[in-house]
């Protein structure tokens, strides 16, 4: 008789190899064809609803690993909420306006693009944005997201733009909009103002220039005394309009080479060394306040400017006397405005080239950086040059063009964010943060910005519905409301197609007045900041339960959303806010095409499978920056195999011939009850971690449980599963335990590795089951009696097992045994022992067990 044929070996179509790269897309097609998302939505429609609002990615280019991290985390949240008994709402979105799309369209054929009308340019930009959405949508779906991608919002939707115009009108009603000539970040390459969130900093070689201005008149200084000044922007010197000193700092008058100089006293020694002025002699100290009303001669031109008192002056760099040019610095601008020096000399045009404002033919037509050498040479001719050096300095750059950014004064529209800061501060207190430091971070970002520049000098954006009368903006509610009504009636593009009179309120037209339309568009952060209107328009719960984006969005989307929400609805558009870190290469370096270390999430999906990428996301502490690369992914693959084979395949293979019934109908042995109890404890722990969005600890708990099961319970039940009769009550009870583990854990695994969970579900032999694992709500928890006793028993056994297995391993290394089944375990107990030695056979696969004395090791036969 062939005894092997009598064994009930595991049988399942759930393969050892996941074949994720081919199977995943089959499951995605299955979910789509069976309309699984829609069925889940209907199934949960009467449950409490939770809304995760999607911060829109920019519709340009392929998705990167940061996009993948973000969208997968959002998918984890939504699936977690479903598992916890909530209905979920998630509407994907795309940010479609802005400069990068304009650049992408124009660079294909610059000459042709330049010849087009505004409407034609805008149409090309729109078509490009739509094409990018189609590409990104397919790429996001490859990640296994449980979303309805047939319904999504775009910031170029007509309805979206109309809501944004209403937001603008609301800001006007609250007297929050004003126009001013003041410095903002300016990109000479992009020829537009930029937001703080569009700036990145790079270390570049910068010139440090020391020069002098000669005193004309002063209460404490002699005429001809030299004011020593430091600057890193020599090109701004022609527009110098003041020098700032700190009123409370101590300044020093000293002599060198028969000339008198003034410098901050605390910097004198270091500057003397730097310049090589070893024989400089100190004369007297002067307080900064005493220098007020001092006047000096411009370093290049025949004009006289004042010394002003400013608290922004620093004592740890430069000379303590600050060159002030209100057109090219915010501190400079506010200081001059405070002292009624209201004229800001804007010497550069939008391309960063000197215009004729200065009436300086040599500078006119020069790019600002090329003017530095010309200006330094002139300083030398005027005997105002002292010293120059090169050093590394963090300078602002345009995050899109990667080119230097300057501060430049221009006429822009601003929102008075300072006027809403008290309301913002009150509302932030109501928001839940996983990390309270992030609450402080958001508050700091919101409260440090007094004004928000919302105008952009670009074609591709939502037009600002503003009309000028004799070059003065008509910021009254009646005029703007009428203009917006016309735009809503005839379409946003009508602004670029119809005459000015079409948008003018007939009641407001005055004879002899020249009217014109605003040519600027609203900045993209004003677009994306108003995306909460998607929820309001769809009559969904507002505010959203959660906003989840990268940590850079504290100065970006979180910031603009908070401001827009307060302006339009008097509340923040989110109840909870969490942020994730950036993705780095496996060595901890920032990813860069130039370094060749960019990790492509789509290539990872093609090589390993989306579930492997998702499992990587599960493995990271998403609140901080995390590394990814081939070596890291290979470790994830090993973890995946353990879950797939040691847990799922073992269970499914041993459920063959199982008659599914009620848990109460089975006769469970002691070891079965312990596993049921431990499964219940795990499920409760996992739910707690999910509520905290702690997916890493979820995975750790699952992995620990799998190792425990495979190292003990699965080992000791193999004889029963393989050798006992199909209908043996003990065997059937153990199958019931395996089934219980599967049904309790498959929902959690579906959060993280949904393709694998679906694969397991389709090979799960339950006769009447939901068509997809995504529709499986999970069974009720089966409780076993004497939980405390089971815990105590398990702890005692674990202690015995650990000691015994350590001794066994030592015996194996010493050559005493070669296999575990050669061991006889002798267990010493007394009346207080929690474990009965006669029941140890249920806990171990050792050959024999018998009671005896501690440390008594049986001899090898």
From Swiss-Prot:
GO terms for cellular component: cytosol. Its main location: cytoplasm. A motif ('HIGH' region) lies at residues 57-67. GO terms for biological process: isoleucyl-tRNA aminoacylation. It is found in: Cytoplasm. ATP binds at residue 593. Coiled coil: none annotated. Pfam families: Anticodon_1, tRNA-synt_1. Its EC number is 6.1.1.5. A motif ('KMSKS' region) lies at residues 590-594. Keywords: Aminoacyl-tRNA synthetase, ATP-binding, Cytoplasm, Ligase, Nucleotide-binding, Protein biosynthesis. L-isoleucyl-5'-AMP binds at residue 549. The keyword Cell membrane does not apply. Belongs to the class-I aminoacyl-tRNA synthetase family. IleS type 1 subfamily. Catalyzes the attachment of isoleucine to tRNA(Ile). As IleRS can inadvertently accommodate and process structurally similar amino acids such as valine, to avoid such errors it has two additional distinct tRNA(Ile)-dependent editing activities. One activity is designated as 'pretransfer' editing and involves the hydrolysis of activated Val-AMP. The other activity is designated 'posttransfer' editing and involves deacylation of mischarged Val-tRNA(Ile). IleRS has two distinct active sites: one for aminoacylation and one for editing. The misactivated valine is translocated from the active site to the editing site, which sterically excludes the correctly activated isoleucine. The single editing site contains two valyl binding pockets, one specific for each substrate (Val-AMP or Val-tRNA(Ile)). Monomer. This is Isoleucine--tRNA ligase. It comes from Mycoplasma pneumoniae (strain ATCC 29342 / M129 / Subtype 1) (Mycoplasmoides pneumoniae).
């Amino acid at each position: 008789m062939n005894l092997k044929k009598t064994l009930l070996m595991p049988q399942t179509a759930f393969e050892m190899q996941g074949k994720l790269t081919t199977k995943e897309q089959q499951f995605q097609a299955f979910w789509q064809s069976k309309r699984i998302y829609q069925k889940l939505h209907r199934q949960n429609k009467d449950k409490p609803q939770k809304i995760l609002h999607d911060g829109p990615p920019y519709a340009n280019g392929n998705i990167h690993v940061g996009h993948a991290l973000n969208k997968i985390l959002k998918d984890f949240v939504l699936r977690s909420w479903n598992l916890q008994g909530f209905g979920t709402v998630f509407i994907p979105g795309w940010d479609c306006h802005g400069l990068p799309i304009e650049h992408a369209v124009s660079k294909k054929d610059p000459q042709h693009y330049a010849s087009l009308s505004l409407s034609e340019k805008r149409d090309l930009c729109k078509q490009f944005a739509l094409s990018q959405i189609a590409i990104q949508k397919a790429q996001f779906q490859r990640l296994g997201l449980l979303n309805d991608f047939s319904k999504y919002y775009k910031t170029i939707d007509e309805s979206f733009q109309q809501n944004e115009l209403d937001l603008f009108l609301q800001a006007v009603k609250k007297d929050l909009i004003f126009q001013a000539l003041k410095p903002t970040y300016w990109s000479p390459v992009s020829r537009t103002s930029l937001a703080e969130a569009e700036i990145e900093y790079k270390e570049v070689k910068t010139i440090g220039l020391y020069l002098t201005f000669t005193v004309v008149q002063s209460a404490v200084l002699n005429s001809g005394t030299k004011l020593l000044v430091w600057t890193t922007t020599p090109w701004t010197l022609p527009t110098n309009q003041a020098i700032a000193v700190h009123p409370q700092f101590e300044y020093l008058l000293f002599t060198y080479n028969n000339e008198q100089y003034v410098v901050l006293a605390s910097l004198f020694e270091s500057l003397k060394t730097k310049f090589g002025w070893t024989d400089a002699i100190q004369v007297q100290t002067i307080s900064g306040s005493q220098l007020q009303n001092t006047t000096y001669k411009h370093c290049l031109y025949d004009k006289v400017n004042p010394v002003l008192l400013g608290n922004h002056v620093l004592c740890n760099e430069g000379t303590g006397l600050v060159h002030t040019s209100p057109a090219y610095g915010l501190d400079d601008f506010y200081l001059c405005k405070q002292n009624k020096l209201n004229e800001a000399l804007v010497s550069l045009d939008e391309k960063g080239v000197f215009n004729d404002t200065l009436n300086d033919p040599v500078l006119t037509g020069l790019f600002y950086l090329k003017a530095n050498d010309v200006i330094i040479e002139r300083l030398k001719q005027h005997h105002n040059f002292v010293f120059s050096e090169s050093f590394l300095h963090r300078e602002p750059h345009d995050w899109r063009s990667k080119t230097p950014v300057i501060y430049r004064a221009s006429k822009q529209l601003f929102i008075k964010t300072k006027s809403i800061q008290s309301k913002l501060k009150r509302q932030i207190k109501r928001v839940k943060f996983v990390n309270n430091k992030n609450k402080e971070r958001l508050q700091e970002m919101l409260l440090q910005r007094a004004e928000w520049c919302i105008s952009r000098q670009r074609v591709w954006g939502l037009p600002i519905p503003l009309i000028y009368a004799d070059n003065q903006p008509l910021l009254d509610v009646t005029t703007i409301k009428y203009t917006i009504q016309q735009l809503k009636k005839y379409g946003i593009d009508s602004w670029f197609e119809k005459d000015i009179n079409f948008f003018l309120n007939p009641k407001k037209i005055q004879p002899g007045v020249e009217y014109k339309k605003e040519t600027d568009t609203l900045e993209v952060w004003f677009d994306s900041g108003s995306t909460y209107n998607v929820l309001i328009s769809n009559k969904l719960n507002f505010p959203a339960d959660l906003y989840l984006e990268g940590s850079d969005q504290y100065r970006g989307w979180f910031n603009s959303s908070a401001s827009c929400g307060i302006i339009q609805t008097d509340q923040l558009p989110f109840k909870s806010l969490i942020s994730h870190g950036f993705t780095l290469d496996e060595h901890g370096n920032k990813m860069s095409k130039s370094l060749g270390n960019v990790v492509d999430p789509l290539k990872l999906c093609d090589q390993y499978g989306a579930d492997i990428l998702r499992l990587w996301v599960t493995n990271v502490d998403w609140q901080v920056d995390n590394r990814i690369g081939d070596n890291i992914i290979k470790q994830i693959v090993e973890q995946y195999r353990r879950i797939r084979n040691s847990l799922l395949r073992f269970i499914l293979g041993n459920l063959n011939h199982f008659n599914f019934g009620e848990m109460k109908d089975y006769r469970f042995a002691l070891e079965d009850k312990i596993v049921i109890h431990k499964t219940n404890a795990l499920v409760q722990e996992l739910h707690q971690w999910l509520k905290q969005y702690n997916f890493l600890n979820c995975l750790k708990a699952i992995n620990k449980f799998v190792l425990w099961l495979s190292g003990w319970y699965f080992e000791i039940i193999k004889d029963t599963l393989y050798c006992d009769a199909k209908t043996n009550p003990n065997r059937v009870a153990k199958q019931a335990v395996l089934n219980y583990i599967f049904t309790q854990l498959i929902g959690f695994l579906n959060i993280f590795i949904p393709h694998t969970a679906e694969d397991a579900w389709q090979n799960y032999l339950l006769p009447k089951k939901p068509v997809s694992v995504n529709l499986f709500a999970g069974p009720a928890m089966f409780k076993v009696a004497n939980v405390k006793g089971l815990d105590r028993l398990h702890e005692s056994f674990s202690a015995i097992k650990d000691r015994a297995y350590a001794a066994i391993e030592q015996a194996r290394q010493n050559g005493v045994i070669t296999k575990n089944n050669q061991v006889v375990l002798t267990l010493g107990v007394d009346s207080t022992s929690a474990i009965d030695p006669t029941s140890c056979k249920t806990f171990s696969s050792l050959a024999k067990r018998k009671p005896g004395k501690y440390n008594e090791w049986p001899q090898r036969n």
